[in-house]
UniProtKB/Swiss-Prot annotation:
PANTHER family: PTHR31232, S-PROTEIN HOMOLOG-RELATED. Belongs to the plant self-incompatibility (S1) protein family. It holds the Pfam family Self-incomp_S1. Residues 1-20 form the signal peptide. The gene is SPH14. One of its GO terms (biological process) is rejection of self pollen. It comes from Arabidopsis thaliana. This is S-protein homolog 14. GO terms for cellular component: extracellular region. Keywords: Glycoprotein, Secreted, Self-incompatibility, Signal. It is found in: Secreted. Glycans are attached at N136. The keyword Transmembrane does not apply.
Length: 139
């Protein structure tokens, strides 16, 4: 009988948290991709998650793309991106732009900045930009 009570407590707690998770909405999380390669240089991006697949698109110098989404309980939210630039899009980098934590995040911002030397990240609008990835070169 004690095990049954513990089992019921766990089930009720789990479903109660699911309902509470949706009852109290929070600001959407954002992934920003910004082109700071230089004037006349185009940045190509392709980002996708488990539920969404953005088309391949280009950003001109000083343009940015904003992807807004909410974390989902049960499925870990993860956005992966491929950035390319250069002649024939020779330089590329593939990385995880956002991954949900163990608890839901509200209003998290991941600002990815593409520059000629590297790719930088600013978390939650806290400068300075921190180096994260280098560019790979295709043969």
């Amino acid at each position: 009988m004690n095990r049954f009570i513990i089992f019921m407590f766990v089930v009720v707690t789990y479903f109660g948290l699911n309902v509470a998770f949706d009852m109290f909405p929070c600001p959407k999380n954002k992934v920003l991709i910004r082109n700071e390669l230089g004037p006349g240089l185009v940045l190509q991006y392709h980002c996708h998650s488990r539920d969404h697949n953005l088309d391949v698109a280009n950003l001109q110098f000083n343009e940015y793309k904003e992807i807004a989404f909410g974390d989902k309980l049960g499925k870990r939210t993860r956005w992966s991106c491929i950035l390319k630039h250069g002649l024939y899009m020779r330089y590329y980098s593939e990385f995880i732009a956002y991954m949900m934590a163990n608890v839901r995040r509200c209003g998290a911002i991941r600002n990815w900045i593409a520059r000629k030397d590297r790719i930088y990240l600013i978390r939650n609008v806290n400068p300075p930009a921190v180096f994260r990835y280098t560019w790979n070169k295709t043969k």
